[in-house]
Amino acid sequence: MTKKRHLHCAAQKVLNNGGCGGIDGVEVEEFRENYTKNMSALYRQLTEDRYEPQPVLRTYISKGNGEQRPLGIPVIKDRIAQQAVKQILEIHFEEIFCDCSYGFRPNRSTEDAIKKVEEYKEQGYNWVLDADVKSYFDTIDHEILMELIAEEVSDGWILDIIRSWLTIGVMTEQGKRRNNGGNSTRRRNFSTFSKYLPTSL
């Protein structure tokens, strides 16, 4: 599979998921209308080491208890790049993730998690712990996160681009920008992508 084919596979997943546009105002349908042009531009940016992510759009949704949950909406081209990297990393990380983990994993669903709970119940387990880490994604230590990823991923380009997404910051709907901090890093050419590419999907 070529790098370009891999990027197109990522694009189809992102576009099929729909969702709102980011700070550039480009919606999914608009991106589709100029698909060839947009994808060619993104591919060149990545392969020519010119890719720069844009700040995510900060918006809020109701949690149902009177509080609001912050969301960060990347622009579509950044979502596609993120999906492409995700598809590469998943190949390795799926082999080491805990079997009891079901959240945001391929070929695993809420129904699968419920089935596992039922199995535990039949084995005599009667207690359930309902826990949540408050503001987890807003407060996670990026340096610790990157150290953990680096234990499994040695490629500098992959690590650099993940760090750039973590530190690019957010833009509010009022046009105010807030940075997440972090150190700037040197990105490496997209050609290193090829060593991670699957032979099939």
Model-derived segments and their meaning:
Residues 70-75:
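Conserved phosphate-binding loops in nucleotide/dinucleotide-binding enzymes
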Residues 45-60, 64, 96-108, 112-201:
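Conserved polymerase palm-domain catalytic core
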